Amino acid sequence: MGKIIAIANQKGGVGKTTTTVNLAASLGVLEKKVLLIDADPQANATSGLGIDVDAVEIGTYQVLEHTKTARETIIQTSSPNVDLIPAHIDLVAIEIELVDKDDREYMMKQAIRDLKDSYDYILIDCAPSLGLLTLNALTAADSVIIPIQCEYFALEGLGKLLNTIKSVQRIHNPDLDIEGMLLTMYDARLRLSNQVVEEVKKHFSDMVFDTIIQRNVRLGEAPSYGESIIKYDASSKGAINYLNMANELLKKNKEKV
């Protein structure tokens, strides 16, 4: 049975979507069957996998609305072993539509539970907020990965996210684990980057992945070509970092790599 992992941080610009797309692609290269669910109205994970967002007619919106089954919305991507439930800007309206429903936090869980037998990993790219979309993802997930950028204000809002996770564990999903914190946008030349790494490891030592994602020009270029870093430049630092991250995740979950 597959594992559902939400990639979440309400702070924007931390490498959340970059991590979701490239972790999915890396796991696919390592011959794991992966489904990426784009739960962010900005739909950057969708476009980052080469899908024309304007051409998306059904996706996460319909899944949460329960007007389409999750299986009906799945599309194949050009990344090996990676499927996608795409997003569109209309997803921004779903929180308003769900707000009056009694089981509003469970809509995604109900919709995707049957997919766990079809995939090794289901990755959910969360919106940069702690609204209903993110609550749905955390309620549906087995665990959560928290990307943290190695920059000023890196820990800002982290306490609020951890409190939200505790609240979800208490009320909606007692089995939710923190898979780990992933340090991103690291530049070894900068004192600040090194200070952030030290600070995060000091406070959350056993929760931090050993792999650190370095700042990399090619990593920033790949989304504009609708490609993962693995496909865009497999020899780049970014590709190597995310393949290392995928291997670390598999080892953590005691899978052969």
Name every feature range the model reports, one short phrase each.
Residues 1-257:
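P-loop NTP-binding core
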